[in-house]
């Protein structure tokens, strides 16, 4: 057992390097810096190749784990072939490579990378080195990017940092810290014109704060939550088609939600639904030609295809089941917030925001290193 752990320790450094390369490149792809996108893509690929070596040389999995690895890996690889965009495949490899590492330490590591990069981006934006784009929509809505190429990035990134801080901290969190985070969230929301993200941040922070005083005794009764991602995906599709048929409720709701249903309907009409990724799908942040599908479930279905949507729904059902099995209320709340808000924002697959994705690697963890309670495939 000690020899096995020593062998793993020698490989852990490579995994941390892989995560660093992947996370930094992914972060920089969203920042207004004159960096060659092809270089960033190759950096992500390099990180993935380092992580891939852990799969090639790893033999300590049971047949079910090998089958699951092969099925998900091949499905995501084949799914990406029509577009040549292998980001989902890269993400899976990075997550898989974390299977025998301590998950809280990994999340803390990614949190540290993102926090430093966020502070550095803010500082460089104040100095004028990073461009602060101004977006004007419908001639009335003025939004600032604050150093990022899309105005919605920083608000949700700040939300994710706050949530992960409350999850990772071992000390009691005082209400004044929650209040300070909420004030900062509304300040960012005011500048970026994303009030909904500010309210979501406030609600999530208060829920996480309340976990210090709330204890769940009957966790088994929460198992139904693992089907919530599938329910929300089905509801999103149904709601869009009802809007396309002229349902008065969803037509009015479309105006309230800043035409989200309109863009989803355009996506279905212009690109349709395929089994695999659609090479013709393209978004635009240009105010004159703006097009984007914010609903993560619809976005996955149209841009990445039916196969990718099914795989991601399975991943999130597993993550919810994992939280319930481990009786981890904080992580469960964070994941459920991401799952519910996926009907409005596409953030389910952004590792530098959804650090909890590394927990999916528990499905492939070496049985000798497992706690019996953790072993979901026994």
Give the ranges of each region predicted by the language model.
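Hydrophobic transmembrane helix bundles of membrane-integrated enzymes that assemble
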Residues: 2-29, 40-59, 64-248, 295-372
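Interfacial loop-to-helix junctions that mark the boundaries of transmembrane helices
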Residues: 35-39
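Long extracytoplasmic/lumenal interhelical loops at the membrane interface
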Residues: 249-304
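Membrane-proximal cytoplasmic C-terminal regulatory module of class A 7TM GPCRs
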Residues: 372-378
């Amino acid at each position: 057992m000690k020899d096995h752990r020593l062998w793993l320790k020698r490989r852990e450094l490579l995994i941390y390097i892989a995560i660093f390369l992947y996370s930094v490149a992914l972060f920089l792809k969203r920042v207004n810096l004159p960096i060659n996108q092809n270089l960033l893509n190759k950096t992500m690929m390099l990180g993935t190749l380092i992580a891939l070596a852990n799969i090639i040389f790893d033999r300590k999995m049971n047949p079910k784990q090998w089958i699951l690895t092969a099925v998900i890996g091949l499905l995501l690889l084949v799914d990406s072939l029509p577009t040549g965009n292998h980001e989902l495949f890269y993400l899976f490899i990075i997550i898989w490579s974390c299977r025998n590492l301590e998950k809280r330490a990994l999340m803390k590591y990614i949190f540290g990378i993102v926090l430093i990069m966020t502070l550095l981006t803010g500082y460089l934006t104040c100095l004028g080195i990073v461009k602060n784009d101004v977006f004007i929509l419908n001639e009335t809505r003025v939004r600032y990017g604050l150093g990022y190429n899309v105005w919605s990035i920083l608000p949700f990134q700040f939300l994710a940092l706050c949530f992960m801080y409350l999850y990772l901290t071992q000390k009691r969190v005082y209400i004044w810290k929650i209040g300070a985070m909420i004030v900062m969230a509304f300040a960012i929301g005011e500048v970026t014109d994303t009030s909904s993200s500010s309210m979501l941040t406030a609600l999530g922070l208060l829920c996480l704060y309340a976990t210090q005083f709330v204890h769940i005794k009957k966790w088994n009764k929460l198992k139904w939550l693992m089907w919530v991602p599938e329910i929300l995906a089905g509801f999103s599709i149904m709601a869009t088609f009802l809007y396309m048929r002229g349902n008065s409720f969803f037509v009015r709701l479309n105006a309230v939600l800043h035409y989200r249903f309109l863009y989803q309907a355009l996506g279905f009409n212009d690109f349709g639904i395929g089994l695999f990724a659609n090479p013709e799908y393209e978004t635009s942040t240009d105010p004159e030609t703006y097009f984007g599908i914010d609903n993560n479930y619809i976005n996955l279905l149209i841009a990445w295809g039916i196969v990718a949507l099914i795989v991601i729904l399975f991943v999130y059902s597993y993550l919810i089941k994992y939280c319930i099995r481990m009786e981890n209320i904080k992580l469960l709340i964070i994941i459920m917030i991401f799952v519910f808000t996926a009907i409005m924002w596409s953030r389910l697959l952004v590792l530098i925001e959804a650090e909890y994705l590394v927990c999916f690697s528990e499905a492939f963890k070496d049985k000798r290193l497992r706690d019996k309670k953790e072993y979901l495939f026994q």
